[in-house]
């Protein structure tokens, strides 16, 4: 039987037609970007990270605008009480952020997003600084093993853990500012995710531009997100923290911590001093507080841009100087430069303004070992976490300060020199212009070299507060015996 004439082939049903040459060709396998670390190059001019999938997450967006910002938490609470008592005022978008964070964080529990259930104990330490301490044994035992770092500006390494590898149920929501975009890049995704080893309820991670896979170096964009969230959450227990590499950071992928702490840090009640000739920038140092810090406060939304830029310039200088640092953002009363060292607002009458404390600190080379507690941003603000029941029960203010002095606090001369340099940076002068001559002689020396230089001229005196106290007591008794 002769085959069908070719002219009739197109008239047959599709399933009876003879295969054409193109149909015989094998289908080329399509490799999804992110399915394999050795993924094929995309035809797009923009190459996303291998692990990143922008459409995979079902997490919602939180949209906000500067109109939602709360400058003074105290006056906002008064206005809210009035509105609730006189009208059916709709809940603000800014209040929805707090509710969304809590709702999504609680919802993540059903997916086993956390390494352990929260079951923490607290105690307040007697002493000058009103330190509070949490017992969190599970965090010390079950958290991800900290990574080893040698430099503050280590490049991002996609082979190590990073937040592009988060599961969908770990992403709480994305951030988007409607009127003033956080980034000009439409592919940027700024997310808030669970912290799998939390300190407190709603403890989360803020990851700016997760698709960019930036190292743990604070950017102006990250500062902006931190300030915005502080202005959006109407709760004085809410804080945002940042730890640099060599300053207790565990992951080299740009992130900040968002969390609540059930006790006020006494840091917000302390007197400061001006940072030389720089307006609206302050310094706090021992003995007013347990460790030195640079302080910034947003007292008007007109100063919003300058506030962000000052924080960024400060951190940028520390990063370029390879100086480890921690940031602690809180709601604090207006900064005082006169009066008593400590003044509490017991009546709740003073404004509560967004305040940023930048703690320059000693560099800690290598992975942080498991110990009684690790002095990071929250600890330097007086909010301590103990990983052992023994230390939790036996710790006192002096033992805590001793650990902070030995592992974090800069010595007086180093901090003084840093303050002069920061004043030059913030004013726009050449760095070193305002530094006194006596500090110039120590420039370029490492901390051990400076200590050796001091030891050659004076007897060694341990920095322990308890030993210092015993020494002064012994000296007084010697004078009395004479």
UniProtKB/Swiss-Prot annotation:
GO terms for biological process: glucose metabolic process. Expressed throughout the neuronal system, in the spermatheca and anterior hypodermal cells. The active site is at residue 255. It is found in: Cytoplasm. Its EC number is 2.7.7.78. Residues 1-21, 461-482 are annotated as: Disordered. It catalyses: GDP-alpha-D-glucose + phosphate = alpha-D-glucose 1-phosphate + GDP + H(+). InterPro entries: GDPGP. One of its GO terms (cellular component) is cytoplasm. Keywords: Cytoplasm, Guanine-nucleotide releasing factor, Hydrolase, Nucleotide-binding, Nucleotidyltransferase, Transferase. It is an enzyme of class 2 (transferase). GO terms for molecular function: GDP-D-glucose phosphorylase activity; guanyl-nucleotide exchange factor activity; hydrolase activity; nucleotide binding. Specific and highly efficient GDP-D-glucose phosphorylase regulating the levels of GDP-D-glucose in cells. The orthologs in A.thaliana are GDP-L-galactose phosphorylases catalyzing the first reaction of the Smirnoff-Wheeler pathway, the major route to ascorbate biosynthesis in plants. PANTHER family: GDP-D-GLUCOSE PHOSPHORYLASE 1. Belongs to the GDPGP1 family. This is GDP-D-glucose phosphorylase 1. It comes from Caenorhabditis elegans.
